Amino acid sequence: MFIRVKPPTWLVLALGLAPSLACAGGLDGLFGLVSGNKTAAISHANAQAGIANYSSADLQAMKQAIAAYKAGDIAKGDALSTPLGASIPGVISEWVAIRTQGIQLGFDRISRFLANYPDWPTQTMMRRRAEEALVAEKQSHTVIRSFFAKQTPVTAGGALALAEAMTATGQHAQATDLIRQFWGNNLFKQDLEQKYLTSFGESLRKIDHFKRFERGIFSEDGDVALRAAQRLGPEEVTLAKAAVAVFDKTGTADKLLSALSPKLANELPAYFIRIKNLRRTDRITEAANLLSQIPHGLEAREGGLFWVERRLVARKLLDMNQPNLAYKVAAGHSAQAIPDKVEADFTAGWILLRMLNQPEQAQKHFDLAAKEAKTPISVARATYWQGRAAEAMGRNAGSYYQHAAAHGGTYYGQLARARLGQSGLPIPNGPSGSVHHLAQRIGIQGLATLYAADERSLALTLVNDLAYALPDAASLDALADLTTAYGDAAATLSIAKIATQRNLPLGQHAFPLFGIPQQALGNAPIEQAFVYAITRQESAFDPQATSTSGAKGLMQLMPATAKIEAQKVGVDFDANRLTDPHYNVTLGAAHLGRLVENFNGSYILAIAAYNAGPGNVKKWIDAFGDPRDGKIDPIDWVERIPFTETRNYVQRVLENLQVYRSKLNNQQSILIVNDLQRGNR
């Protein structure tokens, strides 16, 4: 469905359009036809003409300056950008120069930009560049004190410079506190470490070196740990060497760990390395027993790190058919961060309910998870399983399912709606509120200018910073309106995800209906909603996305996979075209369809295989049973997937699928249960 949408007044103002153009129908020339219920791409020519205070020639000069700065040609960039002055294109050009060239610009230039544009997004990045330049140029103590007068350092080098300036003016205690804080809590390279030691070595105590030693181990930075250990003693060196052996999987950790004294062996970093060593060498029961020995208060200092170990050990124990011990490992957590606490209590409750048939005890854990949960996904999961536990005890579960069902954009919210027999998905439109003030924000003006210049990667950087900075849901929704107006699905989704993290969900903006070429969708061998669901999870609609493993484009295809699919669909293979949206989706949809076919129609197996590969899926079928045979609860099967990334991936794709069916087809029935049960052996 294609409709025209008049942009909100604040957006008109942000673009600098004359008020006369804001009358009904006056913007038809600016906004094109779009798919769904939001405007899509703004025509570049009209956008350039409409934005205030600069010409199309200025915009072109900005683009050329950006290219020059990215290429490292500061002189050319300056020659192009200087005539732009303080216009938005001029500000953007200088910002890009700071981003790309950093200390080459000099401290004075960077600090001047920070002073002149305190509201420009990415302040932390620019302060980092300024501090690096300040240190490189050995600025005077007066300049250093002035720069840090209202803000604390963001780099270890900046902290050292400030501490030295403090010492020069007699503020020895403040300087010492700052040095100790950065020494114990931040990782930095050996040359800077030596500068810290030269200037403040006498102020660093054994406890400060031990904190740095711990930070190196907990961050799995063996070099930092070894250097810190050498300042502590031979035993700590032995533990650091054992840590490196575990990180590098050299097989020599056992001998080193056996040499530790009982005192050091019972310190938190030693527990961490001993447990990780046991887990990585498949001594899972021993790892579980050691986890039970850590004092709760001690573990709580790094509760998140130790929860990761507990989660991995607990799931291994389930694979070994030891659910009682798995429960004890999960329930014994000392997690402090809310997401970790929620996951830990869910895991403990799920083991009790589904593996040990103890619904009353399970309910206590689900209650704890529900009490702590904040995000829609975690709230829906906790309350859904509260309902399952209540049912298992013969009690009315309706109120729990109703609570979960309110979060219709989530996997467990949809399962709750299906359990209640409800139709439709409650994905609301964005919140309303006064947002005209946004047009005055320099970051918004810069964003509109970057879109007019088709600098989308830079625009996304501003978008992400603004999404964390804007004060309320109405402002975030308005920002998403702007990115939607420019047809930037990746930016719109990024805003929605950040909004959800901030507990300010935006509803419909979280599921863009643009960003995928319609022609490629029309030729897909699988339902279009499925392609959207995978794309949203794979690349978040970024056509240029490239993973660390080499997967590319909207549907994140590995070149080898894409080559096979190209041969099968009868198109020439060109690895360079994998970032072309049409080409990528054509091959990606073919691959997805083939996976569904290979798994005899099973969606959950195909989704898992798309993420983790068919080989792993076949291993999981052997280990946990086949969810297609009707004897295995597919909900439990998904929860048994040992890879956290893949387990989360399957659930997110399935929830995306339901929403996109609703948006694309106006489908009211919820088919998530059918999707879980699809396929024949």
Regions found by a protein language model. Give the residues of each.
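Bacterial N-terminal signal peptides
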Residues: 11-20
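N-terminal leader/linker segments that initiate helical-solenoid repeat arrays
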Residues: 25-96, 426-443, 452
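Solenoid-like repeat scaffolds
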Residues: 48-54, 78-88, 99-102, 112-121, ...
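Structural register within alpha-helical repeat arrays
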Residues: 64, 94-97, 130, 162, ...
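Residue at a conserved register position within TPR or TPR-like alpha-solenoid repeats
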Residues: 68, 101, 134, 166, ...
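Catalytic glycan-binding domains that act on GlcNAc-containing polysaccharides
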Residues: 95, 111-112, 116, 281, ...
